[in-house]
């Protein structure tokens, strides 16, 4: 069940938090966080505050949680709901195709960050994201 907070910025989450995932899966947890500042559509809205975070765990790196903070977070979380229901893996999320420019690209990009291969981050942030 998605959890939504209608504030400015909006906050939405579904599934496990990172802390809950670590309690359940120990060190077998990967996360990817992608800033709205790197999404062209956020710049078009003139609101680059926020991020999308994916939480993956287990031997197959299954998606176990999604957090979205920022503009339209309460709408974007629905993609996370579908991915969780489908038991999507980190690869499935990262290899998905999103329309461009959209805020929804953040989910795919967060998956790519978790895999250490982000597309739309500067080289310095790429190194930090994969560390």
Where are these regions (language model features)?
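Flexible, glycine-rich terminal cap/loop adjacent to redox cofactors
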Residues: 5-131
